[in-house]
A protein has these predicted regions:
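N-terminal non-globular leader segments, chiefly Sec-dependent signal peptides
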Residues: 1-64
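Short alpha-helix capping/helix-loop boundary micro-motifs
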Residues: 64-77
Length: 104
């Protein structure tokens, strides 16, 4: 299963920043929320930069994440996915809520 991550919370226009390929052991046996949680985790900057693969010891790099947006000026990585951003699975759109996800 693939999840499209769309940053909308702080942008003037929505911007697709990543496609996240959810591993089969999660997508085949898990819930939709577990797939969304996987995409959320791996598009957050916790121990490095999720959007950069050129950093040594980058705990946030995941080869299952395809970055779709250009990096920020100066090569700075993209921001973390936040409340108000959206995720798309197939034709269903979800918004990152204060706690979990809400279908929109």
């Amino acid at each position: 299963m693939q999840v499209a991550v769309i940053h909308t919370a702080f942008e003037d226009t929505p911007r697709t920043v990543a496609f996240v390929d959810v591993p089969e052991e999660i997508s085949a046996f898990g819930t939709t929320d577990e797939c969304l949680e996987y995409a959320y985790r791996w598009t957050n900057n916790i121990m490095g930069s999720w959007s950069r693969n050129d950093i040594e010891d980058n705990g946030d790099y995941n080869p299952n994440v395809t970055v779709m947006a250009p990096l920020n000026e100066g090569g700075m990585g993209l921001r973390s996915t936040s409340m108000g951003d959206q995720m798309l699975i197939g034709n269903k759109k979800y918004e990152v809520a204060m706690c979990g996800f809400e279908e929109v």
